[in-house]
C-alpha cells in the first residue's frame, strides 16, 4: 500500500508561543516517527500549495479572512484563549488548508492508495467565522 504524505517544513514556522501546546515539536515527532518506523519506501511525498482564495472563500467569509491577514500584517497576536498567530502562522495556515486539496488530487490521480496530511496549524475546530482550538482555518471543510 502506498501513502501520499503531504507536508512542508514551513509548517514549523507557525509558532504560537514557547509554552503553547500546539508547537513545532508535534510535527517533528510525527515525521521522526514515520522515519523511525521505516515507512519511507511506502511514501509518495507532496508539498502543499497555499489554498486559493476561491477555495478558502467557500468556507470562510472574506471579512474573516481579512481579519487574519490584518493580524498577520501586524506580526500576529492572540485570536482567542487557545489560538495564537505568530509571524509564520498565516502562510502555514494557508498551506495546511491547501494540503487536503493536494491529497485529494493525488488520490484522484491514483498517485497513492491513501493520504496523510502532516500539517500545522491544525484545522478542524475553526468555524466559518471564528478561530478556535488552535485552528485558524477549517482545513477539513475546505477539503470537503
Per-range role (PLM):
Residues 1-144:
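HDAC/HDAC-like amidohydrolase catalytic core signature
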